């Protein structure tokens, strides 16, 4: 059916490529002209392009000339002439799309053209990679090219000071990891002084390995957290209790959803163990939560698959890359439950101070593009969520790799035996082999079996990823055998050594299907780069997780009926189709989960944007805060007056409450009396109180210099907004955790979350207004001239292994220097030199 439709309407990808091909022809026509340029002319051309852009020409108008210039510069500086296919990919990137370019097709070089073109606007270009090694390598290599063209390059990484970061962001093109860019955005919105901000407005980003960042890590929020004080004892008690349970009677485990819950017998055991009557009483909410997390830690979280223990710490393993995610912690107490399970010291739960998902961070850029070898399977998601088309760029040379059908064995033991035999045979012939595994423990098991078989090999998994680039670089040499977990080592080419092509190229062996077809395709794609020969094949067993979760029981019983032993595999199209449809189902489920998370995160995104915008107004030196603060005080007064003057009969108005509020929160005692408010309308009461507020405000302003009083206003606003916002994030997180229970009451959880989230936000805004009113009118000015962070020690935590280092925020604090003849800040009225300046 799809084939018929393609014939009638044409293939969308082919149409796009035809359009791009016409532009590539025009670029190629300019090659002779560009070859005539002297080296010195290239920098002059850059200035010429910038002037033309400022004079009204668009980047699209300049594209043909610009790409021809960069191509010529690349020939001279790097000794590489971009192929036509790289030009196709480069145009697609400029248009804000995803270029699907296979491994070894030169994505890095293709990215230099749109990066240079968009840098001409002087608004900055960010090139984002999955790790610091790749970012630094590309910044250094491509930096030579950009320097030749008169364009500056920055490398943004974890170890930089604020000033160095600011410098990196001020460069025309900035390289760095997704984590670092996201954290800088959050940290910029926690600074106390505008001068401490490092990022410019987000203009254009090119994301390398875009599927890894926008799909695999889309559900991973970037979090800046501070520690919350909670007792470790309850985790240990819950852990002790869970150890007494047996899986036959006390709990159920759903392997598909990884959900664990107590049975009726388990609940009775819990009530007896903790000497309580009803586990589900409101008084025991915390206990129930701790028991659930302990259950999850013991039943669904597996050591060396989901996490590993290193230096007495629980380190999460990324399920997609197999890398260690140092510094990242499971939320909601699960990490502490695993620490209790492993007998480690339980660390404090953290309180979220600021967070954002990659989905929402990258959607803030004016234009976004990306490149990867595997994106077509997630085309719908890229289009729906990021408004990006996936354009599959043809390879420069035809793919010569042979992708063989899957071999399915009855048991894991039989599968691994066959894998080792296959590797040994190839090893003895000198053919290099890359073995892909899904879990760390599988890579270690195969390593053990290969040692026994006398096969020399390298292992690349979460435990030794620091040697990643080195191991991958040598994986194509004669006689080399490399075991890699989940295609760690993306971004580094496997080049074939001498004589390897004659042996059939690199052999890729998959030991298990991943739940995502894309990850399987990435593994296959390591072989057969740039027209090289190669083979790929997956060895599966009926005991593999994907086969267990979605495979057919009929198949296993058929193998048994036929009397097939472990040495006889099935090579069946039917099984391969069943595996693929299982993968499609999982991908669909994961897409739905990411869409749901985005819908929930959008609620917080809107609120975050409002707060961050207001916060920027506070730290921006040009803003008039008095007007903002007076509006806040007026809102606070109007709320109080409205609450106590609702009755249509004025006799029933509670004027005493208004007086108590006014004298307690705004003025000195006995400032407002009943006679002041009697016989006045509600709006007249508000007007009277606001008149008094302005009088007191004027008087307070006289106590200090205008600069010092503006600083006092900023101190109060920042402290109030930050503390209330952080509490609000925490409350929204708790609301999010429990909202799914509303589905039992036939309510849409998302709709409920939106409504409750909105009312909680309004309540937070009211609390901010009330507190600002109180502090501005009642606080002692001299004690409030130093801006302070609400939480001292903060830590940036995310799904990437590069962000694990603790970062203690040390703001550059401006000192408010008081001149000798200024009024003393203590409020005495004397000159500083005659008071505290002696």
UniProtKB/Swiss-Prot annotation:
The entry's keywords: ATP-binding, Cell membrane, Cytoplasm, Membrane, Metal-binding, Nucleotide-binding, Protein transport, Translocase, Translocation, Transport, Zinc
Reaction it catalyzes: ATP + H2O + cellular proteinSide 1 = ADP + phosphate + cellular proteinSide 2
Broad enzyme group: translocase
Membrane topology field: Peripheral membrane protein
Cofactor(s) it depends on: Zn(2+)
UniProt: ATP binding residues: 86, 104-108, 493
Main location: membrane
Classification via Gene3D superfamilies: Helical scaffold and wing domains of SecA, P-loop containing nucleotide triphosphate hydrolases, SecA, preprotein cross-linking domain
Gene Ontology cellular component annotations, sorted alphabetically: cell envelope Sec protein transport complex; cytosol; plasma membrane
Entries under Pfam families matching the protein: P-loop_SecA, SEC-C, SecA_DEAD, SecA_PP_bind, SecA_SW
Binding positions (Zn(2+)): 824, 826, 835-836
Compartments where found: Cell membrane; Cytoplasm
SMART domains in alphabetical order: SecA_DEAD, SecA_PP_bind
GO terms for MF: ATP binding; metal ion binding; protein-exporting ATPase activity
Free-text cofactor note: May bind 1 zinc ion per subunit.
Enzyme Commission number(s): 7.4.2.8
A single GO BP: intracellular protein transmembrane transport
Region Disordered: start-end pairs: 793-838
Subunit details: Monomer and homodimer. Part of the essential Sec protein translocation apparatus which comprises SecA, SecYEG and auxiliary proteins SecDF. Other proteins may also be involved.
Annotated function: Part of the Sec protein translocase complex. Interacts with the SecYEG preprotein conducting channel. Has a central role in coupling the hydrolysis of ATP to the transfer of proteins into and across the cell membrane, serving as an ATP-driven molecular motor driving the stepwise translocation of polypeptide chains across the membrane.
Family according to the record: Belongs to the SecA family.
UniProt name for this protein: Protein translocase subunit SecA
Species of the source: Oceanobacillus iheyensis (strain DSM 14371 / CIP 107618 / JCM 11309 / KCTC 3954 / HTE831)
Gene (name only): secA
């Amino acid at each position: 059916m799809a084939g018929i439709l393609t014939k009638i309407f044409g293939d969308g990808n082919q149409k796009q490529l035809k359009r791009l091909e016409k532009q590539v022809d025009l670029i190629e026509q300019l090659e002779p002209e560009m070859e005539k340029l002297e080296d010195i002319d290239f920098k002059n051309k850059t200035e010429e392009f910038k002037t033309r852009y400022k004079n009204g020409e668009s980047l699209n108008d300049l594209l043909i000339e610009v790409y021809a210039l960069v191509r010529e510069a690349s020939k001279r500086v790097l000794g590489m002439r971009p192929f036509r296919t790289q030009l196709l990919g480069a145009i697609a990137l400029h248009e804000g799309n995803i270029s699907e370019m296979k491994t070894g097709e030169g994505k890095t070089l293709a990215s230099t053209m749109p990066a240079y073109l968009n840098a001409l606007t002087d608004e900055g270009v960010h090139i984002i990679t999955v790790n610091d090694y790749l970012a630094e390598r590309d910044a250094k290599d491509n930096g030579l090219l950009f320097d030749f063209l008169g364009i500056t390059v920055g490398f943004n990484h974890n170890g930089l000071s604020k000033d160095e970061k600011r410098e990196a962001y001020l460069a025309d093109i900035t390289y760095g990891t997704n984590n670092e860019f996201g954290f800088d955005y959050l940290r910029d919105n926690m600074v106390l002084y505008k001068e401490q901000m490092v990022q410019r407005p987000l203009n254009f980003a090119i994301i390398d390995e875009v599927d890894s960042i926008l799909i695999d890590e889309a559900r991973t929020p970037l979090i800046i957290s501070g520690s919350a004080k909670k007792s470790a004892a309850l985790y240990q008690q819950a852990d002790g209790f869970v150890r007494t349970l047996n899986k036959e009677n006390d709990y159920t485990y759903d392997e598909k959803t990884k959900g664990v819950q107590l049975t009726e017998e388990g609940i009775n055991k819990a009530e007896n163990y903790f000497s309580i009557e009803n586990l589900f009483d409101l008084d025991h909410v915390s206990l129930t939560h701790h028991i659930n997390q302990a259950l999850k830690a013991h039943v669904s979280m597996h050591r060396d698959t989901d996490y590993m223990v290193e230096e007495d710490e629980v380190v999460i393993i990324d399920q997609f890359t197999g890398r260690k995610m140092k510094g990242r912690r499971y939320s909601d107490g699960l990490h502490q439950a695993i620490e209790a399970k492993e007998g480690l010291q339980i660390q404090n739960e953290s309180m979220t101070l600021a967070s954002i998902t990659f989905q929402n961070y990258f959607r803030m850029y004016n234009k976004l593009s990306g490149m990867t070898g595997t994106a077509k399977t997630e085309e719908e998601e890229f289009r729906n969520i990021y408004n990006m088309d996936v354009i599959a760029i043809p390879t420069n040379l035809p793919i010569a790799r042979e992708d063989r059908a899957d071999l399915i064995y009855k048991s894991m033991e039989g599968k691994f035996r066959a894998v080792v035999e296959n590797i040994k045979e190839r090893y003895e012939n000198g053919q290099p082999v890359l073995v892909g595994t899904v879990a760390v423990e599988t890579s270690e098991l195969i390593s053990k079996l290969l040692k026994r078989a006398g096969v020399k090999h390298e292992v690349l998994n979460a435990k030794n990823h620091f040697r990643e680039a080195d191991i991958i670089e040598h994986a194509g040499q004669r006689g080399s055998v490399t075991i890699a977990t989940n295609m760690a080592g993306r971004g580094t080419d496997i080049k074939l050594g001498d004589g390897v092509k004659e042996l059939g190229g690199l052999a890729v062996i998959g030991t298990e299907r991943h739940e995502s077809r894309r990850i399987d395709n990435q593994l296959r794609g390591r072989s057969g780069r740039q027209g090289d020969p190669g083979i790929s094949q997956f060895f599966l067993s009926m005991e593999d997780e994907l086969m267990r979760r979605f495979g057919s029981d009929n198949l296993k019983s058929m193998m048994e009926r036929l009397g097939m032993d472990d040495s006889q595999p099935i090579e069946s199209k039917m099984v391969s189709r069943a595996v693929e449809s299982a993968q499609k189902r999982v991908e669909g489920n994961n897409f739905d989960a990411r869409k749901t998370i985005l819908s929930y995160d959008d609620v917080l995104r809107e609120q975050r944007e409002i707060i961050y915008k207001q916060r920027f107004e506070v730290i921006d030196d040009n803003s008039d805060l008095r007007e903002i603060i007076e509006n806040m005080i007026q809102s606070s007064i109007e709320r109080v007056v409205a609450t106590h003057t609702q009755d249509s009969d004025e006799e029933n108005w509670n004027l005493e409450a208004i007086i108590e509020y006014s004298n307690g929160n705004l003025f000195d005692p006995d400032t407002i009396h009943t006679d002041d408010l009697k016989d006045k309308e509600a709006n007249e009461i508000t007007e009277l109180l606001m008149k008094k507020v302005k009088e007191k405000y004027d008087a307070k302003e006289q106590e200090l210099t205008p600069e010092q009083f503006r600083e006092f206003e900023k101190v109060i606003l920042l402290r109030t907004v930050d503390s209330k916002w952080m509490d609000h994030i925490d409350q929204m997180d708790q609301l999010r955790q429990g909202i799914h229970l509303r589905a039992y009451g036939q309510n849409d959880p998302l709709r409920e979350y939106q409504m409750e989230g909105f009312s909680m936000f309004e309540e937070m805004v009211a609390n901010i207004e009330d507190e600002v009113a109180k502090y501005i009118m009642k606080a002692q000015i001299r004690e409030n001239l130093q801006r302070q962070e609400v939480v001292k020690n903060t830590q940036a935590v995310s799904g990437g292994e590069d962000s694990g280092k603790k970062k203690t925020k040390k703001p550059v604090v401006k000192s408010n220097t008081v001149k000798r003849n200024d009024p003393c800040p203590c409020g005495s009225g004397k000159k500083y030199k005659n008071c505290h300046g002696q």
